Each structure stands twice: as structure tokens, then as C-alpha cells.
């Protein structure tokens, strides 16, 4: 409230409690992400470009995020419920991009992407609540898991694109 020059009283006039405030923030963030991905997808030449754009955006967010914030979300069951429901919808949307990537010869055609999506979601949730975040930043964990995943699902053509993307990321550091 102080950083925004808003009194707590004003906040509680607009929101009945912290959970409602958090929920509204997550709803707004989700809407922004949907708009962003839609814009990227409409201009992308292939499915990997969409995934790379999502990766960059998520990495930027995680760089700024304190892992304790995610752990504190356990205190707000409605927020967690919303996040889990949105994750299911996001996974369904991701399946469209994976299928497009299969058709483009970028992703392997012998993978059940529904299982992979659910496994990745569970893996990230497990990391958030584990001690690994005490030793490594969320952004590094996200990056390592994402590219381990990408290497497992891409064809040789897709792998060349992944390697080129990773090289460009290293050069920018």
C-alpha cells in the first residue's frame, strides 16, 4: 500500500480481504498473459517461437518473485483453487501449440503432451514448496526444468532451434 501511495483503509474499501485482492491480481495477470500469448501466436512463424516468448516472460517474472510469496499463497485457498483451474486451462491451450509443433516437425509425434503438461505443472508446484528454492533462484530452476523438457520433446529440427535460442540467451547475458 505504501509503495502505491494508497492507504490500507482505501485498499480494504475496495477489497474485503487480502485473499480477494490477491485473487484480483491473479485474474488480471492471467488476462494480460492470455493477451500477450495471443499476440505472439498471431505473429509467430512456428510453435517454438510462442514457447520461447512465454519462457522469456515467465523467466522475467520469476526473477522478480520472492519464493516466500508462493509459499504464502497456501494461506489463501480460493487463490490456489483459481491458480490450479487456470493451470488446467493453460495446459489445454498449450496442447494446441504442441500439436502445431508436431505438424511443423519441431516436436516429436510419439509423446502424450497431456501427460507431459500435467507432469511439468506438478514438478513446478513441488519445487515451489521444497527446499531447493533456498539454494537456487526460481528463475534458474524454471530455466533448467524448461530446457530439460524441451530437449526431451523436440525433433532434431526443433533441437537446433532450441540450441540457437539458448545461444542467443547466453550472448545477451
Locations of the language-model features?
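All-alpha amphipathic helical-bundle segments outside canonical DNA-binding/catalytic cores
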Residues: 49, 85-86, 103-119, 136-143
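A short secondary-structure junction motif
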Residues: 32, 58-65, 97, 101, ...
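The alpha-helix within a helix-turn-helix
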Residues: 1-2
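Short hydrophobic/aromatic patch on the recognition helix
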Residues: 5-15
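Short secondary-structure transition hinges
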Residues: 60-107, 115
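Hydrophobic alpha-helical connector segments
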Residues: 24, 35-64, 117-120
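Short amphipathic alpha-helical segment with a characteristic S/N-K-E followed by hydrophobic residues
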Residues: 17-22, 32
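C-terminal peripheral helix-coil segments that are non-catalytic and often amphipathic
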Residues: 96-100, 104, 136-173
